[in-house]
């Protein structure tokens, strides 16, 4: 993943999850958060989706969280693809969050550091439990402790 | 329903199921220049109609797009420099030298607005396209569909312009042809 120039504050993100409950990114302040924008019809999104669950398991829940933001689809469609994901799946039905986050293509993934800033970005599919990416995440967690 | 949609998208992009990695996508056309790789697959009418109908388009509304000369494109930055590209700077050039630009997603979206296409369908369309402006950091790659403003008969080459820290560059895909359902899908 590539560093985000200037490490700007993350845009706001408050969207319904699969139970209709609003999840606000702000609740995770103090944790490293990987935010993945995706859709079920996007092949690379589907390919990388399982690795989101795998990478989440590599870290303590007190230090790291994954959030998947589905773009433009309904809960039934997403549920049939990912019935019980190990991380929150939020619904950006009108793609307004995508616009706020200046997403230019699917999938796009950003890492929000423990201070709530955009630290890393990846455009296109990745395997998020790849050792290189895991090392990047570990380093951000380590920096956030100091 | 999602498996069916994935199968349709696989037809659109030329990939083999199951999809495991970007390297699994089978591109019919590919060119590499330095660290940049550009790939393309021609798209037919039936597959595009099926895909977008499943996303909420009326068959009549999506017909102009499905009938247009269309491709799925993939572009990858395998180097370390930041790249940028604008679809408006790409040209398809026929054997007679005639150059045709690509129609931008926003131009299609204007048509969808006039046709009162549902918002959810427009969102799916917007993000299934090769975006009008792209920035690629190291390792980034993007795929999406695009259409020519007008058809070209026979084979043609696609000249895709991009920019990096050293200036402007072109990468060329040769021997492209508009897709037909009998052969392309």
Predicted regions and their residues:
Chain B
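Conserved functional micro-motifs across diverse proteins
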Residues: 21-185
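Positively charged n-region of N-terminal signal peptides that target proteins for export
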Residues: 1-5
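N-terminal signal peptide c-region/cleavage motif recognized by signal peptidases
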Residues: 16-18
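Bacterial N-terminal signal peptides
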Residues: 6-14
